[in-house]
Design a protein with these regions (language model features):
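Extracytoplasmic c-type cytochrome modules immediately beyond a signal peptide or single-pass transmembrane anchor
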Residues: 43-103, 107-108, 116-123, 127-128
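An exposed acidic His-Trp-rich patch
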Residues: 89-185
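N-terminal domain-onset segments
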Residues: 1-80, 143-245
Length: 245
């Protein structure tokens, strides 16, 4: 199996221009089951997703690979968020990964080798890249101020940017955009998002609204580890499984 920094072997589900996954149209019987289950099942974890945030993410081993990402956010408590990450907010959106977000206090309690898998959010927030879609800035300002002092760990399980129609190969670690190259997000990518959602993340828009926002006293140097000149890729290797009790 290839690592996350390699393309998978050619399959009918890799490297295509067609975004839809392979498969037959949903059968009527399956649709009926879905409708019936919706009436009787609580789906409690799903109903805890209260926010839709849009931002951007970069591949930790190749910062040229950049994605617009859509987080459906649920709050475990004030210091821990968990996010299902999609490639759009359309009904046909693909679940491409998961991000966990923790406060700076929790992050500082992690061992150094674990910290290296996490990224800071200060620049992403203050630059207006992250926004709660459709929510007025005045309403989301307290939340964005808190988020600027958080750290995230984002695993991408479906690398749609290379044309994969299914989740192939190992998951990829993702990082947040930063102010310095090569970690700056593509301006065209941001412009497309802004136009679609009528967001102004320019110097006269969200950036100006957030310029007075308190910044973290410091950003732990073990986060955003690519700034040290090192990325991370995931290898899947065979091993003997444990048969003990």
């Amino acid at each position: 199996m290839p690592s996350s920094d390699q393309n998978p072997a050619a399959t009918p589900a890799s490297g295509t221009a067609e975004p839809a996954p392979p498969g037959r149209p949903t059968a009527v019987s399956s649709q009926v089951l879905d409708m019936g289950a919706q009436l009787v099942q609580a789906l409690k974890p799903v109903r805890q997703m209260k926010q839709h945030a849009c931002s951007f993410a970069l591949d930790a081993h190749d910062l040229r690979r950049q994605l617009e990402v859509h987080h459906l956010v649920s709050r475990l408590n004030q210091d821990v968020l968990q996010c299902a990450v999609y490639d759009s907010d359309e009904p046909s959106a693909r679940l491409i990964g998961v991000e966990y977000i923790v406060s700076d206090t929790i992050f500082e309690s992690l061992p150094p080798e674990e910290k290296r898998l996490w990224h800071s959010h200060a620049y992403e927030v203050k630059a207006g890249l992250r926004t709660d879609v459709g929510v007025r800035e005045a309403l989301q300002s307290s939340e964005t101020a808190r988020l600027s002092k958080t750290y995230g760990k984002f695993w991408c399980t479906w690398q749609v940017d290379r044309g994969d129609q299914l989740p192939l190969s190992a998951p990829a670690l993702m990082v947040s955009p930063q102010a310095t190259e090569p970690g700056r997000v593509c301006a065209e990518l941001v412009r497309g998002r802004d136009e679609r959602y009528r967001v102004d993340s320019s110097a006269g828009g969200l950036k100006a609204d957030r310029v007075e926002m308190d910044e973290p006293e410091w950003i732990n140097p073990n986060a955003d580890y690519w700034l040290h000149g090192m990325g991370f890729a995931v290898d899947v290797v065979p091993c003997f499984f444990f048969l003990g009790r």
